[in-house]
Regions:
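Short amphipathic alpha-helical boundary/capping segments
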Residues: 1-2, 23, 115-119
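N-terminal pre-P-loop "Q-motif" helix
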Residues: 1-15, 175-178
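A sequence-level detector for short glycine-anchored, His/Arg-bearing signature motifs
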Residues: 7, 25, 56
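Short, flexible, glycine/charge-rich loop motifs used to bind or transfer phosphoryl groups or to couple energy/partner
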Residues: 8-11, 29, 40-43
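A basic/glycine-biased coupling hinge at the interface between accessory DNA-binding modules
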Residues: 15-16, 37-179
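Walker A/P-loop
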Residues: 15-34
Length: 179
């Protein structure tokens, strides 16, 4: 499939790192593949020095498939790259290299166990949402109450602290921890 003018310009722009922002089905993966192949073939960039990072496993799988036998430094999601880095150097920041990654069902099960003890009417998903939002803003459990003062902040802070303690005890990280 041919590249349009804008896509070809993106492929040929080689002045530094690239980010391709476009809607679904617009050819982002095709542009990235052509760009990487162009860098390797024409600019003599060593293939093992190329990182191709995306948001979804589906896109990462597609990039790997389309690259074929070309061996790159890394092709995968942001989460996968972070997990790889933490498995190599996580001990430098107190993370066991053999950590497990909790998905949403693991997280909800953990939260359900915590909230059984405190008798709250809030759902496990409510706590998961609030904890995820806090992590996205880099708010640690000990600082939660200093920042949030709504009617549920105290109980969320309590659950968040216990949640983090249990993750650490279980040598686990959630997807928010990876980023």
């Amino acid at each position: 499939m041919q590249l349009n003018k804008e896509q070809q310009a993106a492929v040929e722009c080689v002045t530094g790192p690239s980010i391709i922002l476009a809607g679904a089905g617009s050819g982002k993966t095709r542009v990235l593949i052509h760009k990487v192949l162009n860098l390797i073939a024409k600019k003599k960039v060593p293939s093992r020095e190329v990182l191709m990072i995306t948001f979804t496993n589906k896109a990462a799988s597609e990039m790997k498939r389309r690259m074929g036998a070309t061996q790159l430094g890394f092709v995968g999601t942001f989460h996968a790259l972070s997990a790889r880095m933490l498995r190599i150097d996580g001990d430098q920041i107190g993370i066991d290299k053999n950590f497990v990654i909790y998905d949403e069902s693991d997280q909800l099960m953990l939260i359900k166990g915590i909230i059984k003890k405190i008798h709250t009417n809030f759902s496990p998903k409510y706590f998961l949402h609030r904890i995820s939002a806090a992590k996205g803003e880099l708010i640690q459990p000990d600082n939660y109450l200093k920042i949030f003062m709504d009617y549920s902040a105290e109980v969320v802070s309590q659950v968040y602290k216990e949640y983090q303690l249990k993750l650490r005890k279980n040598k686990a990280l959630d997807f928010d921890d990876l980023l």
